[in-house]
Swiss-Prot record:
Biased amino acid composition, Polar residues: 141-152, 420-434
GO CC annotations on file: axoneme; centrosome; ciliary basal body; ciliary base; ciliary tip; ciliary transition zone; cilium; cytosol
Source species of the chain: Mus musculus
Oligomeric and partner information: Interacts with IL13RA1. Binds to microtubules, TRAF3 and DISC1. Component of the IFT complex B, at least composed of IFT20, IFT22, IFT25, IFT27, IFT46, IFT52, TRAF3IP1/IFT54, IFT57, IFT74, IFT80, IFT81, and IFT88. Interacts with IFT88. Interacts with MAP4.
Record-stated family: Belongs to the TRAF3IP1 family.
GO molecular function: microtubule binding; signaling receptor binding; tubulin binding
Signal sequence annotation: none
Name of this chain's protein: TRAF3-interacting protein 1
Major subcellular location class: cytoplasm
Length: 625
């Protein structure tokens, strides 16, 4: 709103009233209570609009209903329009709803002008109480004001015309009342009908007056309902999104936990199978006969078919335990066949775990077909690590091919081999999807395990002591696995039950903590909700404090004035009472003197009575004699 409008209101009303304070914030959007206080203060100080409201309406506690507020403001607007003769576009319903602050300020400015020019509002009050509206009067006076000059003679003519109109209207009213009395005497039966007509007219007038406010009220109500509906919709959407997010988070956590358990079980089974294979391979045959060397050429087709069939079985079943059982059966049949088939089986198994199923299907066949030929010729692939290339070769083996220096890591080999199925990976790579926790508990055997198996198959029993050349890594791996197996075997059923109890207790604690977190979240949300109204209240407190301080200063000054007046009156009273006090003391002294005299007279009387008695007694005695 424009600041000039507020300034004009402060200038117009500030000369008339001192309370309530005409602050810019209140005048920018004046509430009904504030307007009620202004109007009642104007009536109390200036007498303008006196008699317009009842004693109940003068108290703001009784004007709380919307209709009562509208009628209160409508009366004031009608009186101001009749007295000032200027039109007012302010609507009571809009003012009560908090709209149109500029028009509300215009109403306050007109009230201030009427009070400053000391215009009488008695006639307007009577007309408004009789049910007249201020529109026609305002229009008539507006047209007359536009036509009349602004000098004093024009005003005098207007007042004279107004007086003549008054007299003529009074004469007309008198004649009309006389006619009305005659009609009443003649037509007493038509009274009820006329009353009904008057009532209907009054109702129609009230309806016309309150039609616009009702429309505005309905519009405001519809707007509020639409806003409330939009807020509810947004709130419901937000709640739905939150619930969906929580469900997704829960599913993610449960899936993560299940995946971890699956990976742990898989690693445990794999390690147990490896230990079993290692023990059986160590206890098996370590020597080779020349017949076995010769029979390798004849067994080539069988090896190829058996290896391809075994790999297809592994892929179709998908269980690693069956693969390990087949490997154990092959070891028991013959050391030569087991030595040729184990690397291919191991490689196909790890390719299934580490890579995608499609890569495993592509690589399984070539790996199973090519590896026996490589082992038959006793050729070491160039892709094997340096530790595997340093294995001592038996005397019956053919000369090794020239060594090719490769500086590629096992990780790059995994990336390169994903493209085709012809290359054979000589390094067993464990699943990379396992978590760091599983890596800390279980040590994966890769290249050293393959080198150990090849060493056991190719080297005679007398050369098994060369395992020490691998370093302490294999020994540490075996020791940790043995310790883990001992721990697994040493676990008693009671301890397992205890671990289950601990898990259930941990879950309960987790549920309790999640509930407490939920409660904390709810309390934080309620705190944030209550923070906004608290901030608004703090904004209004400043205004209330200023008003209270001004009122306190006013009462302090009034108290001081009354105390001074009391002291002056006290001094005047004391000065007036002092001579009276002196007279009173004198009178009291005189009273005391008179009482003393009375006492003395009484004493004389008593003495005289005694004398008289004695004389009478003596006379009596003398007469007897």
């Amino acid at each position: 709103m424009n600041a000039a409008v507020v300034r004009r209101t402060q200038e117009a009303l500030g000369k008339v009233i001192r309370r309530p304070p005409l602050t810019e914030k209140l005048l920018n959007k004046p509430p009904f209570r504030y307007l009620h206080d202004i109007i009642t203060e104007v009536i109390r100080i200036t007498g303008f609009m006196k008699g317009l409201y009842t004693d109940a309406e003068m108290k703001s506690e009784n004007v709380k209903d919307k209709d009562a507020k509208i009628s209160f403001l409508q009366k004031a607007i009608d009186v101001v329009m009749m007295v000032s003769g200027e039109p007012l576009a302010a609507k009571p319903a809009r003012i009560v709803a908090g709209h149109e602050p500029e028009r509300t300020n215009e109403l306050l400015q007109l009230i201030g002008k009427c009070c400053l020019s000391k215009l009488s509002s008695d006639e307007a009050v009577k007309r408004v109480l009789a049910g007249d509206k201020g529109d026609s009067r305002g229009r008539a006076q507006r047209t007359s004001k536009a036509q009349e000059p602004n000098n004093k003679s024009g005003k005098e003519e207007e007042s004279r015309i107004h007086k003549e109109d008054k007299r003529s209207s009074e004469a007309k009213e008198r004649s009309a009342s006389a006619e009305h009395k005659q009609k009443e005497e003649l037509k007493e039966d038509s009274k009820p009908r006329e009353k009904e007509r008057d009532k209907e007219k009054a109702k129609e007038a009230d309806r016309d007056r309150h039609r616009d406010p009702d429309r505005d009220r309905n519009r405001d109500g519809e707007r509020e309902k639409a806003r409330a509906r939009a807020k509810d919709r947004d709130r419901n959407n937000r709640d739905r999104d939150r619930e969906a997010e929580r469900d997704r988070e829960r599913d993610r956590r449960s899936e993560g936990g299940k995946e971890k358990e699956r990976v742990k079980d898989r690693d445990r089974d794999r390690d147990k199978g490896r230990d079993r294979e290692r023990r059986k391979s160590k206890n098996g045959e370590h020597t080779r006969d020349p017949d076995r060397e010769k029979s390798r050429d004849a067994d080539k087709p069988e090896k190829k078919s058996s290896s391809s069939g075994e790999i297809s079985r592994k892929l179709s079943d998908g269980s690693f335990k069956d693969v390990k059982a087949e490997m154990e059966a092959d070891i028991s049949v013959g050391a030569s066949r087991s030595s040729t088939l184990k690397p291919s089986k191991r490689r196909s198994k790890h390719s299934l775990e580490g890579d995608s199923p499609s890569d495993a299907e592509v690589e399984a066949g070539p790996a199973g077909q090519d590896k026996p030929e490589v082992m038959e010729n006793a050729e070491v692939p160039s892709e094997l690590p340096s530790s595997l290339r340093r294995i001592p070769r038996p005397g019956s083996a053919r000369p090794a091919p020239p060594r090719v220096k490769r500086q590629e890591s096992t990780e790059t080999l995994v990336v390169d081999r994903s493209g085709s199925g012809k290359t054979v990976s000589s390094v067993i790579i464990d699943s990379q999807n396992s978590d760091n926790e599983d890596d800390e508990q279980f040590v994966v055997e890769a290249a050293p395990q393959l080198s150990e198996i090849a060493d056991i198959d190719m080297v005679p029993s007398g050369e098994l002591e060369d395992e020490e050349k691998h370093g302490g890594l294999v020994k540490k791996i075996l020791e940790t696995k043995k310790d883990y197996e001992k721990l697994q075997q040493s676990l008693k059923p009671g301890e397992k039950e205890r671990s289950l109890i601990f898990e259930s207790a941990w879950k309960k604690e987790k549920d309790i903590v999640s509930k407490e977190i939920e409660k904390l979240r709810v309390s934080i949300q309620t705190l944030c909700k209550s923070a906004l109204p608290l901030g608004k209240i703090m904004d209004y407190i400043q205004e209330d404090v200023d008003a209270m301080q001004n009122e306190l200063q006013l009462w302090h000054s009034e108290n001081r004035q009354h105390a001074e007046a009391l002291s002056q009156e006290q001094s005047i009273t004391d000065s007036a009472v002092e001579p009276l006090k002196a007279e009173l003391s004198e009178l009291e002294q005189q009273i005391r003197d008179q009482q003393d005299k009375i006492c003395a007279v009484k004493a004389n009387i008593l003495k005289n009575e005694e004398k008289i008695q004695k004389m009478v007694h003596s006379i009596n005695l003398s007469s007897r004699r």
